[in-house]
């Protein structure tokens, strides 16, 4: 094991739940405003998960007041308090970029049984 792998191994988090594309998640993010710190929840559908190790990221998409909002998070970021999996989605793709063009009921993802 070389030095970079050792540093990566020590920075990995072990409290990350198993989730993938199509799952609806609540991401509790630490937000620092001045000297105050608070937790902000970002709820949406995971449209991709890519990378590996310390560089792994995932993108969450939600509709806010009719506008699509996407946010990309590093999985092992210290700014993420925790992640809750709300529902498991039944999808056949690893990247759900096609959801960007869909609106309303067409953008619904079937729930896994």
From Swiss-Prot:
Coiled coil ranges: none
Keyword RNA-binding on entry: no
UniProt record, GO biological process: translation
Key word Ribosomal protein present: yes
Molecular function as annotated in GO: structural constituent of ribosome
InterPro entries per record: Ribosomal_bL19 (IPR001857), Ribosomal_bL19_CS (IPR018257), Ribosomal_bL19_sf (IPR038657), Translation_prot_SH3-like_sf (IPR008991)
Keywords: Ribonucleoprotein, Ribosomal protein
GO cellular component: cytosolic large ribosomal subunit
Protein's job: This protein is located at the 30S-50S ribosomal subunit interface and may play a role in the structure and function of the aminoacyl-tRNA binding site.
Family: Belongs to the bacterial ribosomal protein bL19 family.
Cited NCBIfam families: rplS_bact (TIGR01024)
UniProt name for this protein: Large ribosomal subunit protein bL19
Organism, scientific name: Mycobacterium sp. (strain KMS)
Gene, per the UniProt record: rplS
